[in-house]
């Protein structure tokens, strides 16, 4: 998909299913890829008996990574200028996750958006067009598990 400034308006929403029925195997695979073997994520006995959680749970960065993958698919490779957020609830094995990206501003001339470091035409200097997005990932019950913002370069 190619995002164009002329096709976007505030409030326009894009939705993407990230995962259905997240498995413990996927969580452990992420632990291996990231090197984060915290037993809260990988050891059921530790998570339940020692830490008092109902189960192991996914790494926050796994959730952000899946959200970022969908975001990059939406805005196109090489177009993401900034992406950040916070983890608002745990993600459990068996969860279904859906990301929603909502346009909050379109800057046809580079506008006030741009990268978090002020780059990518962030001062309305006639740079590339950008779009600002509110990012929200929820589980199957509608509970928000990640909330953030992103800015991407787009076509005029």
Residue ranges and their predicted role:
Residues 1-13, 91-156:
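HotDog/MaoC-like acyl-thioester-processing domains
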Residues 1-56:
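Catalytic strand-loop segment that frames the active site of acyl-thioester-processing enzymes
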Residues 12-14, 18, 26, 79-83, ...:
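A generic structural signal for short beta-strands and their flanking turns/coil linkers
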Residues 19, 68, 150-151:
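Residue-level structural signal for beta-strand termini and adjacent loop
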Residues 23, 63, 137:
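Ser/Thr-centric signal marking residues that sit
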Residues 48-104:
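Hydrophobic beta-strand-centered segment that forms part of the acyl-chain substrate-binding groove
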């Amino acid at each position: 998909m190619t995002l164009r400034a002329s096709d976007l308006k505030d409030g326009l929403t894009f939705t993407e299913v990230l995962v259905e029925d997240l498995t413990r195997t996927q969580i452990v695979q992420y632990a291996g890829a990231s090197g984060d073997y915290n037993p809260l994520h990988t050891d059921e006995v530790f998570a339940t008996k020692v830490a008092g959680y109902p189960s192991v749970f996914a790494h926050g960065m796994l959730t952000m990574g899946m959200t970022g993958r969908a975001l990059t698919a939406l805005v196109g490779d090489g177009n993401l200028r900034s992406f950040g957020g916070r983890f608002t609830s745990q993600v459990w094995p068996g969860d279904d996750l859906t990301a929603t990206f909502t346009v909050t501003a379109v800057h046809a001339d580079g506008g006030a958006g741009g990268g978090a470091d002020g780059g990518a035409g962030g001062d309305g200097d006639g740079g590339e067009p950008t779009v600002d997005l509110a990012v929200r990932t929820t589980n199957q019950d509608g509970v928000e598990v990640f909330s953030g913002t992103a800015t991407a370069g787009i076509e005029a």
